[in-house]
Every structure is written in structure tokens, then in C-alpha cells.
Swiss-Prot record:
It comes from Polynucleobacter necessarius subsp. necessarius (strain STIR1). GO terms for cellular component: bacterial nucleoid; cytosol. This is Nucleoid-associated protein Pnec_0645. InterPro entries: YbaB-like_sf, YbaB/EbfC. It is found in: Cytoplasm, Nucleoid. Transmembrane segments: none annotated. Belongs to the YbaB/EbfC family. Disulfide bonds: none annotated.
Length: 107
């Protein structure tokens, strides 16, 4: 009985590993855009948090300090979107596998 339980657990772990690889590839291909000031500044990042694009409306260029703050705000919004998408996608990859509280994926 113990042997069958262990084999089942190993199979489940292998399936989770395959799902994790697929999910990580999906995350790498993901792009999200955060924006600030009603779209005057847009920042696009990948699921790996790599900066892809920054779009700035010409009207936002008059005040340098404000523009700097808007870029940070737009990036922070995009970052939060990736965090949420990552958590949702990873929870699907680990479905059925008990994880310790506070355990974060990917490793």
C-alpha cells in the first residue's frame, strides 16, 4: 500500500513538473501594459518582468518630474498585472498538489 501511494505521488509530481514547464513558457510569452494618467504613459513588460515598450504621449513631456512619476506608476501597474497572472497560472499548474503556506512558484 505504501509503495502504491508513493508511485502515485511521484506520478503526480511529474505531471505537475510538466504543467509548470508549460506554464512558465506561457508566462514568458505574456505581455501586459500598465498605464498612468489615463493612458498618457504606457509601459509594456513581459511575464518575466522584462521591459518591452514605453509609450509617452507628447503632452506628458512638459513636466519631467511628473513624467518620471507616471513611468513608475505605469510600470508598477504592469508589474502587479504580471504578479496576478503568474499566481493564477501557477495555481492551475499545481492544482491538486498540496503546497505549503507561503510557498511561491516559480522557484
Amino acid at each position: 500500500m505504501m509503495k502504491g501511494g508513493l508511485a502515485g505521488l511521484m506520478k503526480q509530481a511529474q505531471q505537475m513538473q510538466e504543467k509548470m514547464k508549460t506554464t512558465q513558457a506561457e508566462l514568458a510569452a505574456l505581455e501586459v501594459t500598465g498605464q498612468a494618467a489615463g493612458g498618457l504613459v504606457k509601459v509594456t513588460i513581459s511575464g518575466k518582468y522584462e521591459l518591452k515598450r514605453v509609450q509617452i504621449d507628447p503632452g506628458a513631456m512638459d513636466d519631467r518630474e511628473m513624467l518620471e512619476d507616471l513611468i513608475v506608476t505605469a510600470y508598477t501597474e504592469a508589474f502587479k498585472q504580471v504578479e496576478a497572472a503568474s499566481a493564477q497560472m501557477m495555481s492551475g499548474a499545481t492544482a491538486g498538489m498540496p503546497m505549503p503556506p507561503g510557498f511561491k512558484l516559480p522557484f
